[in-house]
Amino acid sequence: MPLRRFSPGLKAQFAFGMVFLFVQPDASAADISAQQIGGVIIPQAFSQALQDGMSVPLYIHLAGSQGRQDDQRIGSAFIWLDDGQLRIRKIQLEESEDNASVSEQTRQQLTTLANAPFNEALTIPLTDNAQLDLSLRQLLLQLVVKREALGTVLRSRSEDIGQSSVNTLSSNLSYNFGVYNNQLRNGGSNTSSYLSLNNVTALREHHVVLDGSLYGIGSGQQDSELYKAMYERDFAGHRFAGGMLDTWNLQSLGPMTAISAGKIYGLSWGNQASSTIFDSSQSATPVIAFLPAAGEVHLTRDGRLLSVQNFTMGNHEVDTRGLPYGIYDVEVEVIVNGRVISKRTQRVNKLFSRGRGVGAPLAWQIWGGSFHMDRWSENGKKTRPAKESWLAGASTSGSLSTFSWAATGYGYDNQAVGETRLTLPLGGAINVNLQNMLASDSSWSNIAGISATLPGGFSSLWVNQEKTRIGNQLRRSDADNRAIGGTLNLNSLWSKLGTFSISYNDDRRYNSHYYTADYYQSVYSGTFGSLGLRAGIQRYNNGDSSANTGKYIALDLSLPLGNWFSAGMTHQNGYTMANLSARKQFDEGTIRTVGANLSRAISGDTGDDKTLSGGAYAQFDARYASGTLNVNSAADGYINTNLTANGSVGWQGKNIAASGRTDGNAGVIFDTGLENDGQISAKINGRIFPLNGKRNYLPLSPYGRYEVELQNSKNSLDSYDIVSGRKSHLTLYPGNVAVIEPEVKQMVTVSGRIRAEDGTLLANARINNHIGRTRTDENGEFVMDVDKKYPTIDFRYSGNKTCEVALELNQARGAVWVGDVVCSGLSSWAAVTQTGEENES
């Protein structure tokens, strides 16, 4: 009769049970029905299971290591018995960030292994540095490797954010409103206003952007302008966009300085995408550590411990995100079981880089369409009419080690233009930037800049120069200017000194020069606040006009609790003024900052200017808008008043909410249902945001992953039980507005004394409410949490009889003593016969 087939689960259980029965072969004990493989007797039943095939775990083991405590599972292998020969049918590798990695050669050998037989020692050699060892006693497969066969576990420099968490239509509207009034000295005045709107409506990763402004609202000169009307999809590392936008909003990888003002109607496509996040905070040169077993890696610089990280066995790249920027050496120390295994010096190369960061793949973008060029004029000398033209171009950017570059080639109005941008750090102290433009009408431009940190770390220097010559087609002006400046930190030489900064600008085209020199020193810093000294001079000369010189000196006093005060003097326009300024900041409330300033001429000839001027301002942060109100009376006698306010509105389905924040064009609506001024907090990626009332909208940056956790607010007396919807994980694209509707119970800790209708105390009685139960003490007193939506307590007795206490908790917050309360429906406690739980529930 044929043997019964085993299911995969039964095979594994049966096999693990049989390994304990295996014995070394012995002539007197050998069973004629058993088979011997690798020195182990295989019973016939287990032999049949092997013939059917079974899966065994695959572990990586470092050659020379004692025991298997540091082995790591890296996959599984399917083994089977074929005509008395044990073989591996296939190996399935399992990727894990914490596991050791094998070299590419070893990995290829493993993945291509098929029907490979074990030798008599139950071993399959793979390379000179790796082999497979099968243990039938433990029923596991080991990949035994030397260090040379190990790969390196590198940290990912890029990651796609994945699909959107919002699968329905939603929208974010950002608004910015401003109004200003100028009151003239002769009594006249003028008022103007504007309203800018930016709307992004999205369905998953698809979104449409509308951006425009209204000007002169309420006046006879009202105007409007649409700056962008565009469809965009940025997903999985590629971006497509199509529609209308002005040249100020044109996205490009490389410089595009020769594009004149106007509107573009066209398309673009490329891999310059925000949906792929590049990590540029790691060292460009990986810091690698080898661990023969699980242990620690210590990074030390100049005797200072910078980082301690834990790793399993293998070659691992050390996380350098938290290390300081710069190029420097660190000592990498590997510690296993409390002993230093190795110590070596490696170089960290972390520099601020533009774009996608060092090591990112080549980025590219192609674009084109119809170009409406606006009318152009240069100081009234040159004038070009508005014109329609074609536009087409391509951009690309990349990096090699610390060197980064970008290039753009495009054409319009029968002109071809090429532009490049190069950035090259030289060591850790010097950074060189070059930007060039060349056009077919003989136009060219060169912008060069060098910044350097001088030895000792107490000073820095920068030099910039621009030269531009424009031919007869491009709508751009010539330029010829240079600038030089630096900062000297004298504090590093002597602690009582401060910081001195100087700059010089020379515009040779307009024959203008501008000098500045500033000095700042901290005079006092302690428990009572800080006192700083500021002094400076500016000198400006334009063409043949006489030089204009301004000077100032001021003392800045910063006090605890957000107070700031400044007093000083300035000299400009031929007279000297004394200045006073004060500012107060608030952590809570609608008004966040108030300030005022006052200036009075104390010497010199003021001419037509007033001797007294000043102003006041306030910054506010309300539920639906935030902004600034400013009133200022200038020395020329004009009184200027302006108000700015901005905010956002989020919408999805039946849910709509507004906010005074404008953090991004995506967001979350929290429909908490809290009554009145109830408050909880939302913890989003580690940041805490207050949520007040029934519904809140929180704008967030698009192309981001967010971990959202609702919790009680430390600033509220109320206590809430967040039953469901406490934690959420969101991926948001532009225009995505997620809705979180948690089940929130407002809890009040109620204490009191409960009586029957005749006044007798309910002693040692088990009482219940909507969410829990408790027991009174000998005096009928109790303490229990109550949901404010269900402010009742009941007591069940005599089987199915119930009495109930109705609590008045409308104004209660946190904890409340309700005193004596009556359980209506229970005439007397003495009349209740209590036998254990018989009269309680």
UniProtKB/Swiss-Prot annotation:
Pfam families: CooC_C, TcfC
Entry-linked SUPFAM superfamilies: Carboxypeptidase regulatory domain-like (SSF49464)
Keywords carried by this UniProt record: Fimbrium biogenesis, Signal, Transport
Residues spanning the signal sequence: 1-29
Highest taxon in the source lineage: Bacteria
Chain segments annotated as coiled-coil in the UniProt record: none
Regulation: induction: Negatively regulated by H-NS. Positively regulated by IHF and EcpR.
Functional note: Part of the ecpRABCDE operon, which encodes the E.coli common pilus (ECP). ECP is found in both commensal and pathogenic strains and plays a dual role in early-stage biofilm development and host cell recognition.
Protein family: Belongs to the EcpC/MatD family.
Protein name as catalogued: Probable outer membrane usher protein EcpC
Source organism per UniProt: Escherichia coli O6:H1 (strain CFT073 / ATCC 700928 / UPEC)
Upper taxonomic lineage: Bacteria, Pseudomonadati, Pseudomonadota, Gammaproteobacteria, Enterobacterales
